[in-house]
Amino acid sequence: MKWLACCLLGVGLPMMTLAAVEPGKDPVPSVMWAFYHKQLLGDAPFVFDERVRLLAPPFAEDARQVPLEIDARAFAGDVVRVLAWAELNPLPRIVDFRPEARVLPWLSIRIRIEQATPLRAAVQTRDGLWHVGSTLIDAAGGGCTAPSVVRTQPGWEEHLGEVLGARYPRGDTSRLRVQVAHPMDNGLVSGIPEFFLNQAQLLDADGQVLARLELFPAVSENPNLGFDVQGPGQTRLMLRDNSGNQFEAAIP
C-alpha cells in the first residue's frame, strides 16, 4: 500500500507543481484576459513570459493587413501548440499552430484588427504549462468589417487557391514564405457569408507532416504565412477552406 501511495503521489506531483506556478503580472493589462484564459486555455496553468515574442507594428496603418510574427524559438523542441488571438476583435481567434520536429516554433502571418487591442500568443510546452506572450497594437479601426478587396477584382474566382511561395536558406534552416489567393470572408460584411481557409498542413517530400495549422477569419485576405524549416528538401502545402475546397502547392 505504501508503494501504491508513493506512485499516486508521484503522478500527482507535476499537476500540483503546475498549479502552484505564479503567473506574474500581465504586461498589457486587459479586462478580457480572464475570459480568454478560461475560453481558450481552459483555465490551465500559465505564466506571462517575455520569451514568447509578438512582433507587430505599434500602429496598424492598414487594419486589414497587419503583419504579425510569433516567435517561441526559445522553447524549440519543447512546443506542443501555439494559440494566437486579438482580444478586442469581434472574431478574436487567429491561428492554432502545431509545429512538428523539423519546424521551429516561429510563424509569420497577416491579420485584421477592428480596433486597438492586446494581441496574445500562448505557447504550450510538453509539461502542459502555457507561456503567454503579449503586445498592444493601436488602430484606426474597421479592419474586420471592411469589404474584401479581392472580390472587387474581375475573375478572382479563377485564381482561388493559387499559391505563390519561395524558400530562403538561412544557415541550417530555410524560411518559407507563401501567399494564398483567397478572400477570407469573415461573415461580418452584409450579404457575404463566411468563406475562409480553415486548415493547412506543411509536409515534406515523403508526406510527413511538418506542421499543422487551424486558421480563423481574423486572418487577412490572400493569407501570407511564413515558417522556419530545418534541413533540406521540397515541401508541400495542403489547404482546405470551410466550403470543402482543397488546394495544394509544392515549394522547392
Each PLM stretch: what is its role?
Residues 100-107, 217-228:
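Aromatic sugar-binding surface patches on proteins
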Residues 125-132, 241-249:
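Short acidic/polar inter-strand loop motif in beta-rich domains
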Residues 5-14:
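Bacterial N-terminal signal peptides
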Residues 110-116, 228-233:
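Surface-exposed, short loops/turns at beta-strand junctions within beta-sandwich domains
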Residues 36-63, 153-169:
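N-terminal edge beta-strand
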Residues 27-29, 141-166, 175:
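Low-complexity, Pro/Ser/Thr- and charge-rich linker/hinge segments at domain boundaries
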Residues 179-192:
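Short amphipathic, basic-aromatic surface patches that mediate peripheral association
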Residues 136-142, 252:
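Short beta-strand edge segments in extracellular beta-sheet folds
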